[in-house]
Amino acid sequence: MFTSLRFLCFGNTPLPSLNSSRSPQRTPSLGSSSTSSLSPIEEELATPSTPESNDSGLTLSSSIGPYPIPSSLMREVESIRSHILQQKSRHQNQPSRRHKQKNRRQRLQEVAIKQSIASSIREKAKPIATPTCYYDVSSPYAEDTSVFELNPAGEKNTNEEEEFGIASQHDWDEMINPHYNYLGAQEQIWDGDLDSSAYWGLDDLISQGYFETYDNSSVVCHPKQDANTDESYSISKALTISRNVKQPNGDTGWWLVKHVDPRALSKLGSDCVIL
């Protein structure tokens, strides 16, 4: 009864006999390893294998117990291991989400400060009044190109005597049309004594964007040569440009001028000084 219970609990491996002094010695001694009765599989299992190690904490072994791993499987495992290492390194090098949000807030604050400064500068540089007429000498109507200014009533300031026979007021639609030019070459612009040669070549400067009404300074040009080939501009005269001039009759006009560029003025053969 005891024997059958012994086989039931431990399988086919019998327990050592009580009289073990008469059973053969299965454990090899230290000096007789060559006479060991262990099978090759048992020796392989008993011998600890030394796996290949790396700094990442992942280990690779070329065999599982006594069975070698195929080279194709080893290459696949190595590929997976390299991919894991790359992902781990990339994750460590990337800044955290909180750090990204902090940098983004800083950039937005810098942009907001710059925009507020730029807005303040633009507000200070904004002219008191916007020119009420537009001008484009590149239009097919711009055969005779002159500069004109408007008074607050929307009327073009001309010589009261109209010695050139030009009307003092034109159709408003024509005034605000940027592709229309109706002025004569010698048309008087200022009233009274302030109409001296204001029609000299300023149209060329305006058409190329060289003036802007943004401050109270005046630009005085002493032409060395004619800015136009038209005979009506053949007389060389001084030209004074001012942003806001009060006429003798009380009218206040605005020049349609843009940005001052000394290089552009020199190309036109003029010596200009910003006063």
Curated annotation (Swiss-Prot):
Transmembrane domains' residue ranges: none
Biased composition regions of type Low complexity, renumbered to the chain: 27-40
Compositional bias segments (type: Basic residues): 88-106
Feature: compositional bias, Polar residues: 14-26, 47-60
Induction pattern: Expression is down-regulated by the HOG1-MAPK pathway downstream transcription factor MSN2.
Description of the deletion phenotype: Displays significantly decreased fungal growth on nutrient-rich media, while no significant difference in fungal growth was observed on nutrient-deficient medium. Displays also distinct fungal colonies with different morphology with much less dense and thick aerial mycelia. Leads to a 204.4% increase in conidial formation and a 7.6% increased germination rate. Shows slightly decreased trap formationand exhibits significantly decreased nematicidal activity.
Superkingdom of the source species: Eukaryota
Region named Disordered: 13-65, 84-108
Purpose of the protein: Regulatory protein; part of the gene cluster that mediates the biosynthesis of sesquiterpenyl epoxy-cyclohexenoids (SECs) such as anthrobotrisins and arthrosporols, metabolites that possess a novel hybrid carbon skeleton consisting of a polyketide-derived epoxycyclohexenol combined with a terpenoid-derived monocyclic sesquiterpenol substructure (PKS-PTS hybrid). The SEC pathway plays an important role for fungal soil colonization via decreasing fungal nematode-capturing ability.
Name the record gives this protein: Transcription regulator AOL_s00215g275
